[in-house]
């Protein structure tokens, strides 16, 4: 028996990042990695956002985040905007606080209808915090490349943690590389003991960046909020952009502000509802064929 048996779920997306949200605040029983993989086989998603009973006073819920391969993630900005949209529906509150593995996240209604802002917290730059498998005194750009030594295909990424590890490769054209091929190689590179999210980014000007991401545990994605935050922060660290930038992702636009007053990163963007459903218990007992045959 699974904690997800017969549970109502909402299928949503955050500018193309496929999200499933399930409210389990009345259900303390754990959801397993096998459960998360079973859901992905029938309701394809990038992240599964599970609202579990609040652990801390003043928070709405503890949000557990699964990738579609059954691994857990500490943060998912696009998913948190979807959670915020669901929780703000029918509520008069203007702000909500959630607990995640990465810490507390605050969410607000955005500057316009359909937009939501998430405070993603402070970025981390120390090699142990990202983490990396070996010491780098300066993580603004590290020695890492893929391809021939004298003509690398991708090289010298910036590395940042926004609750999960990110590597950003600076390129002239984000569509000129086979990220579906290089992404898994770099995600699983030995330098990243917890694997990493891999982003290709092009700085258009001081207020605009375009990017594509191979998401750890999920693969190619139309949008990754924590990657957008990491990319914006990494560019600002290199003095190549301002601290507020517009990010263009395959799925749409995000506004990222790296706030100077407290070092927090704010992400603003949309969240769309697609449909609701209930999980068939047979999904978790193995009675349903994942192929649909």
Curated annotation (Swiss-Prot):
Arranged from A to Z, the UniProt key words for this protein are: Amino-acid biosynthesis, Cytoplasm, Isomerase, Lysine biosynthesis
What does the record give as the reaction this protein catalyses? Answer: (2S,6S)-2,6-diaminopimelate = meso-2,6-diaminopimelate
EC number assigned by the record? 5.1.1.7
Task: Give a GO biological-process term.
Answer: lysine biosynthetic process via diaminopimelate
Task: Pinpoint the site Could be important to modulate the pK values of the two catalytic cysteine residues.
Answer: 166, 215
Among its keywords, does the record have Cytoplasm?
Answer: yes
Q: What do we know about how this protein assembles, alone or with others?
A: Homodimer.
Describe the family membership recorded for this protein in Swiss-Prot or TrEMBL.
Belongs to the diaminopimelate epimerase family.
Q: Can you say what this protein is called? A: Diaminopimelate epimerase
């Amino acid at each position: 028996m699974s904690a997800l048996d017969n549970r109502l779920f909402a299928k949503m997306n955050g500018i193309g990042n496929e999200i499933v949200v399930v409210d389990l605040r009345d259900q303390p029983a754990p959801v397993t990695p096998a459960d998360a993989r079973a859901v992905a086989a029938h309701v394809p998603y990038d992240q599964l956002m599970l609202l579990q009973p609040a652990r801390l006073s003043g928070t709405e819920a503890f949000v557990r985040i699964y990738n579609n391969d059954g691994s857990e993630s500490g943060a998912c900005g696009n998913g948190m905007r979807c959670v915020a949209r669901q929780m703000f529906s029918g509520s008069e509150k203007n702000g909500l606080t959630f607990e995640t593995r990465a810490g507390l996240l605050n969410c607000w209604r955005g500057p316009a209808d359909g937009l939501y802002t998430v405070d993603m917290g402070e970025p981390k730059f120390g090699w142990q915090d990202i983490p990396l498998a070996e010491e780098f005194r300066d993580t603004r750009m590290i020695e890492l490349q893929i391809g021939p030594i004298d003509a690398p295909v991708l090289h010298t990424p910036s590395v940042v943690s926004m609750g999960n590890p990110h590597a950003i490769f600076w390129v002239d054209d984000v569509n000129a590389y086979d990220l579906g091929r290089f992404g898994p190689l770099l995600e699983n590179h030995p330098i990243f003991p917890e694997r990493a999210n891999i982003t290709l980014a092009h700085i258009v000007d001081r207020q605009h960046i375009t990017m594509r991401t191979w998401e750890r545990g999920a693969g190619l994605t139309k949008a990754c909020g924590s990657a957008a935050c990491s990319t914006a922060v990494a560019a600002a660290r290199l003095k190549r952009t301002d601290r507020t930038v517009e990010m263009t992702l395959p799925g749409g636009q995000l506004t990222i502000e790296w706030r100077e007053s407290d070092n927090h990163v704010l992400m603003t963007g949309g969240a769309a509802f697609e449909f609701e459903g209930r999980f068939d218990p047979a999904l978790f007992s193995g009675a349903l064929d994942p192929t649909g045959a």
